[in-house]
């Protein structure tokens, strides 16, 4: 049996990563796992800052890694709607697939700040989707580089 493929996304807040994730999961018949959905169901009232986000996001990662690897080993592809916006995040995601000898693809959703902020404000999540949060998160954003050995679709 061939392992499934791990699909993940790089792009700023509001760039359209989650919209693309939903579409690709549907098109490919893949399992969609969304960080935003998990965090909102488990920790909604507890996340009010970047520090809170990092704390609770890090709590999800070991469980998500194991779950995704089990799915991939059964030949089912996974669309993992978790950010791949820093080199360390991309390394974590690539390692999920590498450890079980699965392929991976990172979709880079490249949008300018103005478009991202406009989309972000349309979402209507006043606790997390703010211009201030956008800038606080975006200062850590880095585009994928060839040296990372990430299969990237631009």
Each language-model region and where it sits:
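Hydrophobic anchor at the beta1->P-loop junction of P-loop NTPases
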Residues: 9
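Phosphate-binding P-loop
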Residues: 1-3
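The conserved Walker
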Residues: 12-13
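Conserved substrate/cofactor phosphate-moiety recognition/catalytic segment
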Residues: 19-76, 115-118
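Small-molecule kinase domains that catalyze NTP-dependent phosphoryl transfer to phosphate-bearing small molecules
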Residues: 122-154
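Conserved phosphate-donor/acceptor-positioning beta-strand/loop module used by diverse small-molecule
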Residues: 100-119
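Glycine-rich phosphate-binding loop used to anchor ATP phosphates in small-molecule kinases
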Residues: 55-100, 104
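Conserved glycine(s) of the Walker
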Residues: 16
């Amino acid at each position: 049996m061939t392992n499934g493929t791990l699909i993940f996304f790089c792009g700023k807040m509001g760039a359209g990563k989650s919209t693309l994730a939903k579409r690709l999961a549907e098109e490919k018949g893949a399992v969609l796992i969304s960080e935003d959905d998990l965090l909102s169901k488990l920790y909604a009232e507890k996340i009010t800052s970047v520090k809170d986000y990092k704390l609770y996001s890090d709590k999800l990662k070991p469980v998500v890694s194991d779950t995704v690897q089990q799915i991939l080993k059964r030949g089912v592809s996974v669309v993992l709607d978790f950010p791949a916006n820093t080199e360390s995040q991309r390394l974590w995601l690539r390692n999920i697939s590498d450890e079980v000898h699965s392929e991976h693809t990172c979709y880079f959703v490249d949008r300018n700040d103005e478009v991202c902020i406009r989309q972000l404000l349309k979402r209507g999540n006043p606790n997390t989707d703010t211009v201030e949060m956008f800038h606080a998160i975006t200062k850590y954003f880095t585009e994928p580089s060839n040296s990372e050995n990430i299969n990237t679709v631009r």
